[in-house]
Structures are given as structure tokens and as C-alpha cells.
Amino acid sequence: VYFINNVTVHNNTIEIPQTVNGGYDFSHLSLKGIVIKDEDLSNSNFAGCRLQNAIFQDCNMYKTNFNFAIMEKILFDNCILDDSYFAQIKMTDGTLNSCSAMHVQFYNATMNRANIKNTFLDYSNFYMAYMAEVNLYKVIAPYINLFRADLSFSKLDLINFKHADLSRVNLNKAILQNINLIDSKLFFTRLTNTFLEMVICTDSNMANVNFNNANLNNCHFNCSVLTKAWMFNTRLYRVNFDEASVQGMGISILRGEENIPINSDTLVTLQKFFEEDCTSHTGMSQTENNTHEVAMKITADIMQHAD
């Protein structure tokens, strides 16, 4: 059953008008359970559509317009979605599998529990997108814009975010594994309560990033800017800060556990410790002249009890 301008059409087939660019105009239709395979839908218009349990497989959907569409359990499988528009969509339990979705506009999109895997997202724009509980796996996304996006409670594995903008992104309680963030921007990014494993942030700008209560395992921040970053109650294991800029950084590594997850491979180079933390653990008050001495004393104290 299709709904066109509030008129129900019960025919098995209907004639879909064409857009001015040669595509098909499905705008504002309610489509449930449709399966479209091996079709050229480039320049088509699905704006304002309601798509439930829809499947698009092996379709060319170049420059297709899905703005303001509502999608429930939709599947894009091996489709070309380059230069398409998904602005302000509301997607629930949607999947993009083995798609090319480069230069796509997802700004202000809501994508609850989306599953994006084996997909190219180069240069795509997720500005202020809400993507809670999303699952990203084997995604190539250099130069992607995720500014102010919400990826809380999400799982990201095997992602190439090289040269990406993740500034002010909310990654609270997310899981990040095998992530390439080389030469990326993470201004004011929220990584609280986050698990990070094999995350490479070499030459990245991470000023004011928040790692409070995070767990970092085998991560690299070589030559990155971590000015005024926060790392309170943070667990570090084999984390590399070689030649990183850490002016004004605040840090309080978890102590007092039987197996503190830190070892000699960890390099903690700090310019600032909070006075209370320094005094309570070293008996020394920090001054401009003894920053290095205080840092070494705290590091030695940690290593003494480390496994």
C-alpha cells in the first residue's frame, strides 16, 4: 500500500513521476517492506519519506535526496550513495553495508543504533548528528566532519579517521579500537568513561580533550597537542606521549589498586599537577622549578606498585 497525497492506491504497480534531474520522485511516500535491487536511482527524491523494513541492494543512488526521511530497519547493501543528502533524517536500526557514501550530508541526522560497516565515508558531513549506540566497523572516513556529533555508548573498530574533525564530539562510554586519528582535530572532545585500545592520534590537535575515567591501552599521542587536556582517574597502559605538548594538562592516574595498569613503556610528561594531588602522593608542593622532580616522584611511586 502506498500513500500519495493522503490518497491510498491499492494497485500492484504505480507510476512514479520523475525529478527534473532524471531520477524518480518518491517524496513523502510511505513505503513498507519494499525491496529494490540493481536499479539506477541516481538523482531520485525520497525527501520526507517513511521507509520501514526497506532494502536497497546493488543500487546506484548517486545524489539521491533523503532529507527529513524517517527510516526504520532500512538496509543499504552495496549501494553508491556518493553526494547524497541525509540531512535531518530519523533512522532507527538502519544498516549501511559495503556502501560508498562519500561527500554525503548527514548533518543534524538522528541515527539510533545504526550499523555502518565496510563503508567509505570520505569527506562526509555529520555535523551535530545524533548517533548514540552506533556500531562502526571497517569504515574508511578520512576528512570526515563529526563536529558536535553525539556518539555516546557507540562501538568503533578498525576506523580510518585520518585528517578528520571530531571536535566537541561526545564519545562518553564509547569503545574505540584500532582507530587512525592521525593529524585530526579533537578540540574539547569528550572521551569520558571511554575504552580506547590501539588508538593512534599522532600529530593531532587535542586541546581541552576530556579523558576523565577513561581506560587507555596501547595508544599513541606522539607529537600531538594536549594543551589543557583532562586525565583525572584515568588508567594508562603502554601509552606514548613522546614529544606531545601538554601545557596546562591536569592528570590524576588511578592508584592504590593491586594491579595498576601502567608500566615502564608509559611516558608521562606533565607541565602541571593539581596541588592537592601532588602533596597527597609525594609530600611535595609543586613550584615552577620542581615540576620535573614532582613528575618523576609520582611516576616512581606508580611504578613501585605496578604489575
Region locations from a protein language model:
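Tandem repeat scaffolds
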Residues: 1-303
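Short, solvent-exposed mixed-charge patches
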Residues: 305-307
